Amino acid sequence: MYLLTDEVARELKKPFGKVYKELPSIDGKVVSIGDVTTKHLLSNGIIPNLSILDFKTKRNIPVNIPHKFKTIFEVENPQGCISDEAIERIKYLSTIHDRDMALIIKGEEDLLTIPVIKYFPEDTSVIYGQPDEGMVLLKITDELKQKIEKLLKDMEER
């Protein structure tokens, strides 16, 4: 399990990619992280390979996503950490070439962008919400994977 440190929290406040109000066209494998982002993609006809959700926004405001996902997995991931269970499930899901999968989080999904970038293949599009700004779209690259490895080293490991 990895615990968020103040140093990493400061780093994560900065978007990892370009922030969009409306996304450009997206091709290839897509992972969405967050309820509002996923709802936006689905309402625009974009079905991610994997959607990571906790059915809340801003920690406690409920979000209704009227979509029936093809495959659903659940894991626990407490606030401010990346659980071993979440890491193992994301690692497994990164090997599946299916669409319309959901990973439902009991707890909080905010930090799960980190293991998604670590385990999903290069050129995967990752989309997550940047509170009160829009959505961040990034493509996984080797350089981004190296940045994530550094962040993980700066987190407290238990």
UniProtKB/Swiss-Prot annotation:
Keywords: Coenzyme A biosynthesis, GTP-binding, Kinase, Nucleotide-binding, Transferase. It is an enzyme of class 2 (transferase). The keyword Coiled coil does not apply. The keyword Protease does not apply. Pathway: Cofactor biosynthesis; coenzyme A biosynthesis. InterPro entries: GTP-dep_dephospho-CoA_kin. It catalyses: 3'-dephospho-CoA + GTP = GDP + CoA + H(+). GO terms for molecular function: GTP binding; kinase activity. GTP binds at D35, V36, D54, K56, E109, D132. Belongs to the GTP-dependent DPCK family. Catalyzes the GTP-dependent phosphorylation of the 3'-hydroxyl group of dephosphocoenzyme A to form coenzyme A (CoA). PANTHER family: GTP-DEPENDENT DEPHOSPHO-COA KINASE, UPF0218 PROTEIN TK1697. This is GTP-dependent dephospho-CoA kinase. It comes from Methanococcus maripaludis (strain C7 / ATCC BAA-1331).
